[in-house]
Amino acid sequence: MNLTEDYMVFEDVAIHFSQEEWGILNDVQRHLHSDVMLENFALLSSVGCWHGAKDEEAPSKQCVSVGVSQVTTLKPALSTQKAQPCETCSSLLKDILHLAEHDGTHPKRTAKLYLHQKEHLREKLTRSDEGRPSFVNDSVHLAKRNLTCMQGGKDFTGDSDLQQQALHSGWKPHRDTHGVEAFQSGQNNYSCTQCGKDFCHQHTLFEHQKIHTEERPYECSECGKLFRYNSDLIKHQRNHTGERPYKCSECGKAFSLKYNVVQHQKIHTGERPYECSECGKAFLRKSHLLQHQRIHTRPRPYVCSECGKAFLTQAHLVGHQKIHTGERPYGCNECGKYFMYSSALIRHQKVHTGERPFYCCECGKFFMDSCTLIIHQRVHTGEKPYECNECGKFFRYRSTLIRHQKVHTGEKPYECSECGKFFMDTSTLIIHQRVHTGEKPYECNKCGKFFRYCFTLNRHQRVHSGERPYECSECGKFFVDSCTLKSHQRVHTGERPFECSICGKSFRCRSTLDTHQRIHTGERPYECSECGKFFRHNSNHIRHRRNHFGERSFECTECGRVFSQNSHLIRHQKVHTRERTYKCSKCGKFFMDSSTLISHERVHTGEKPYECSECGKVFRYNSSLIKHRRIHTGERPYQCSECGRVFNQNSHLIQHQKVHTR
């Protein structure tokens, strides 16, 4: 190899900082930088890679002493001007840098031997009674490539890798308090008198001692908060400035701390580096692992006498027992509502004050508390940190995981005292009980309408705003909520995941299955307060009540026809627009709505799902079954206004009325 063409210069290993970056470093980091620069230069000189020209300034005047171009304020602190003797030829050099350059003139001193000798030199500083270590063939005039250490008996060459050097006296790569790796002796020279901890550098000891003295010299000019290190102050100030210099290369999300972006990127890579030694479960963050390990390690001595559930603390047990006793000691002075926990009351009171101080920087939404904001942000990041150990499914919320796990166990410990139904969790039980109590705690601030469920209110409010944020990727239709979109998408996929355990019929929606099962059970939960008639569906109940009050509020703007239900008006308007979006896959016919398409498909399948309980006859359509049952009941609901004659079908009445008009 031609050394004149391939040798390394000091600039190849020099570490430079800009003026701005140098200002950010604290004293410890600056001194450490100087140590590393001096050692790098000494290494280069020792292997003959530094070729300083006469008119070229020494590194001490360029960048070693400070590390920033045109900044030399720390030069005197490095003590590089003291005369130094050469251990090989006893020459006296001006300073340590000239000594390092001079050492390069001794060709036998390879980089490995230099490091090895440096180790013994450090040992000599701590063991004054020992003699100076010597090397075989340690002569200026001998240029052998193989050099042997008398103290360790180890051979060295100039061609092997520096990083593979293993020193017998205890040298090891060491990472100091600020994370810069350097070679350090196994013995530390500076000890803390408070805790006995050892350090290799005096300035590192000084920084450590701030922990004991509680010295915090760095103050935030915005809020006055004090910090031990300048780097901590810089991180804190980003809270005031909103600066987020660390950006995720996958999704573009920005973070104020590098640690946060590293943790966030594990979501994209799927990395879960923290594994539980007990059960093998892996986690994204160490805090999640520590929290999980309490399941294995911490005892649960407090057992509920009602259900046998065990808790870590008595406070948790007392809070849990309120579920069984129904105790709600915390009352809202605005609306009189009571809560089991004070935290629930505090959260509820923000409903009255309208306070939402926590802001999502992704979508601009405001939230009542930081926990809700953090949980909401998982919608944007896609993070699902909770995993089911039975099926491996991941969940965004811990409560959803707990609820899901009961699917595997079949556990339904919460019973409704009114109807005897069992539920998986208390929240579902409380929501169900509103059916019996009639409670509707959620009010629309636009029209004053009350709702039983929060999600129903949110859905209703989109009627006022016109918002339909959920779009179908197949047909481009927009929907007010994700559930409706998912149900709609099953029209395209043909998926029917909800199956009736009685007759095996499958449905697209869970609510449709629940309604269908009332055919088998005979349940009719909706009663008309006017005539006492019961109905299987709430929609039929509402439509029936309009007959009592003559209410017809939905008018067609094309022909003036009035309808009692908005859905009927929408269906009717398709007569004018001739819109038929639903196509039969068998014969290619188009229909105005999905229900008509489903009814039509029975022509091809031969399905007749509606059976008469009296005679067992089956029908394709529910309307046909209703007409047929009037034969058994004798019901004739259609009366002629002219002669008073009654009929069991509307078509028969219309046919009869022609007699009077002739």
UniProtKB/Swiss-Prot annotation:
Residues 8-101 form the KRAB domain. CDD domains: KRAB_A-box. GO terms for biological process: regulation of transcription by RNA polymerase II. SMART domains: KRAB, ZnF_C2H2. Its main location: nucleus. A zinc finger (C2H2-type) spans 190-212, 218-240, 246-268, 274-296, 302-324, 358-380, 386-408, 414-436, 442-464, 470-492, 498-520, 526-548, 554-576, 582-604, 610-632, 638-660. Belongs to the krueppel C2H2-type zinc-finger protein family. May be involved in transcriptional regulation. This is Zinc finger protein 17. It comes from Homo sapiens (Human). The lineage of its organism: Eukaryota, Metazoa, Chordata, Craniata, Vertebrata.
